[in-house]
Design a protein with these regions (language model features):
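Structural signature of hydrophobic alpha-helical transmembrane segments
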Residues: 2-12, 64-75, 118-131, 196-207, ...
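Interfacial segments of multi-pass membrane proteins
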Residues: 223, 303-313, 377-393
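Short helix-boundary/re-entrant hairpin motifs in multi-pass inner-membrane proteins
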Residues: 83, 196-266, 293
């Protein structure tokens, strides 16, 4: 088991070294190596996840949680790889380094999940923040990427100071930083005021790293509408690592110090505030990418509430919060990226597929069946009611209704305003039936089916277009040029949709199987 977890850390790190070298031979080798690495990792995760169940029931809680987290990490990185392969131009400098850093991100996240002491956990999270800043810098050319990276480092600096202070105090009070030492101190009955305070400082810093939106919005990279979707997916991965660290530490404190009620209650209250604040903000945004970020923050609030509660049922709901946050937010971010390309061939592609995919992602984030987000909301509400936390349960239920209304309003805005309904029934031009002499007629046909301000050909007549000049001729022959590339653009969205659907439908059967096998509610 240890060798398997170690392979999840080392293989992406080794592949990250070869990506820039292979990209010099062929540009597309960068995303190919990254995609194959993540696909192989997912296969290597799925098989042991089911093989460990009947063999050793005593190791099931830790092993299943670790494999589940590693699977979500590889899933998020795989979706980011597929989308970035078509969003990042092949001529962009440093394009191969983006995929190399993405592989390194997966390695760091798996290392944080497998960490057995507080210092290693913080070290992985801190390096992950620096890698995320580097990926933001190369996600878009010019000053946009550099500004987003510098903002990210500036905002996370106070959080890093709090984490370092907490780890230093924890080392001075305990003598080491291992999880087992904290458990032994709790069982021995010694005074534990200083260790709990130190862990509180560490969790506060990680909370700031997971929810950067508490900082001023104009200085937050999460609210930069000019940042590409690849950058937002990178920030999602960085938040995922901080969210997991908070969850891991809070469960450890809850189970070790059963009478540390103040810390657990404070974490629950913080999660409830984050949930309410992000839900209300999602109702007032007009950009789909920003709405997806707010939905991700609301999932973080639910996760902190579940971690503060600390019951087996709330821990089970936290697993599906991770799944819903990872897949649902990715789905909405990709749909938001397609809406921005108003002068490219992907606009009609969005209106032919984006309506359904956006609705599916929004329903999952809102907790509507049959998607995985339904189980995360339902289990958390049941756990809160069962523990007597009725106010928190009502807030979680009301937030689902408000998030659903935000999704429906955003969908109505995108598909009914500004003549968007014209794109949904737009006919594609058969490229094989076109000749060089047909270019003027086809260009006229494109202009007739487009709004004046959204002329498809204008994006390729402009010298500042983000696409290469040698592809403008092929664009005039087919506004949806590159069938393979357009499906590559939609592949992570459909992949996330299938994960959400399968997670919601197969969960009862998987739960009954694990429950009958282990006889335990805590998976």
């Amino acid at each position: 088991m240890g060798n398997t977890i170690l392979s999840f850390i080392l293989i992406p790190a080794v592949a990250a070294v070869f990506v820039p070298v292979m990209a010099k031979v062929k540009t597309r080798m960068a995303e190919s190596i990254a995609g194959l690495t993540f696909l192989a990792g997912l296969v290597n995760i799925i098989v042991p996840l089911f093989l460990v169940v009947p063999s050793d029931t005593g190791r099931i809680p830790a092993d299943c949680m670790l494999f589940f987290t590693a699977g979500l990490i590889y899933l998020s990185c795989l979706c980011t790889t597929f989308y970035s392969a078509s969003e990042l131009e092949t001529s962009r400098p440093g394009r191969s380094y983006f995929f190399s850093l993405l592989l390194l991100t997966a390695s760091l996240l798996c290392g944080a999940a497998a960490a057995e002491n507080f210092f290693t956990l913080y070290l992985y999270i801190e390096v992950l923040g620096l890698v995320a800043a580097a990926m933001l810098a190369v996600s878009r050319s010019g000053t946009v990427g550099l500004t987003a990276a510098s903002d990210w480092i500036f905002i996370t600096l106070p959080a890093s100071v709090l984490c370092i202070a907490g780890i230093s105090l924890l080392f001075l009070s305990m003598g080491n930083l291992s999880y087992e030492s904290l458990k032994q101190m709790a069982l021995s009955g010694d005074p534990f005021g200083a260790p709990v305070f130190a862990v509180t400082l560490l969790m506060t810093g990680l909370l700031l790293k997971a929810c950067i939106f508490l900082m001023p919005q104009e200085r937050s990279s999460d609210f930069r509408t000019d940042l590409p979707v690849s950058g937002h997916l990178v920030l999602q991965l960085a938040r995922l690592g901080a969210m997991y660290a908070v969850f891991r530490i809070s469960i450890l404190i809850r189970f070790s110090f059963g009478n540390a009620a103040f810390l657990s209650s404070s974490l629950m209250f913080t999660g409830a505030v984050i949930l309410v604040w992000s839900t209300l903000c999602a109702l007032n945004v007009k950009d789909l990418k920003r709405m997806a970020c707010f939905f991700d923050f609301s999932n973080a609030g639910m996760l902190f509430t579940a971690a503060g509660l600390g019951t087996p049922l709330s821990v089970l709901s936290a697993l599906f919060i991770f799944l819903s946050s990872t897949s649902g937010t990715t789905l909405l971010l990709i749909c938001g990226g397609l809406t921005e390309r108003k002068k490219t061939r992907f606009q009609s592609l969005f209106y032919s597929h984006g309506s359904f995919l956006m609705l599916a992602g929004g329903l999952s984030q809102s907790g509507i069946p049959p998607f995985a987000g339904f189980w995360s909301r339902l289990l958390l509400v049941i756990a809160l009611f069962d523990s007597g936390r009725n106010v928190y349960a009502v807030l979680a239920a009301v937030s689902s209704v408000l998030m659903l209304s935000a999704v429906l309003r955003q969908r109505r805005k995108l598909f009914t305003e500004n003549g968007a309904e014209k794109y949904r029934n737009r006919q594609e031009i058969d490229k094989s039936a076109c000749t060089e002499s047909d270019r003027p007629a086809i260009k006229t046909e494109i202009e007739n089916h487009s709004n004046p301000e959204e002329d498809f050909s204008a994006g390729y007549q402009d010298e500042s277009s983000e696409y290469e000049p040698d592809r403008r001729k092929e664009f005039l022959l087919d506004p949806l040029y590159g069938n393979g590339e357009k499906w590559l653009k939609l592949l992570p969205a459909w992949f996330s949709f299938l994960i959400l659907l399968c997670g919601g439908i197969l969960f009862p059967f998987l739960y009954m199987y694990l429950h009958l096998t282990t006889g335990s509610l805590f998976l």
